[in-house]
């Protein structure tokens, strides 16, 4: 009888010990996972340290190069539309992104005489409409974001809203759970 009681109590102790240990581990990781925001001085110091790395040096060279200046100038021409989230008229120049790009699905568009990469993050249901785009289609784009990278010779516009012939063909779906 004692052996049966011990056989029942021993697994109960082992399981309760494991549960207690896992709850302690969860508490420790939750305390560590919330870093405090950096102050302006700390942020500037981190930026200076990064600028001294090989990647930072290459980035600064790119910014000062004619290619970097061209990208910044193209960004400046659409900055008001980006900030105000207003319509930008463009013409699709290519359905393919530059060779070696890792941006996912996108197209090349000419807006006000400058070329841009328009990047999309479509749901599977939205891909069919985006695949219906053709070269020389006139589209209207709205975006909240424009970015750049030394790897690309064009600014990268995140396509939040696209319409063709007064019909919406893409509207970015907000992510679940916030941002």
Describe these PLM feature segments:
Residues 83-103:
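Structural detector for short beta-strands of small beta-barrel domains
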Residues 76, 91-95, 118-129:
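N-terminal post-signal-peptidase region of extra-cytosolic proteins
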Residues 87-92, 136-144:
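OB-fold and OB-like beta-barrel modules that bind single-stranded nucleic acids
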Residues 1-4:
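Positively charged n-region of N-terminal signal peptides that target proteins for export
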Residues 100-120:
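OB-fold (S1/OB) nucleic-acid-binding surfaces
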Residues 6, 17-84, 177-179:
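OB/S1-fold single-stranded nucleic-acid-binding modules
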Residues 146-178:
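OB-fold/S1-family single-stranded nucleic acid-binding modules
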Residues 124-142:
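Short nucleic-acid-contacting surface segments enriched for D/E, G, S/T with interspersed K/R
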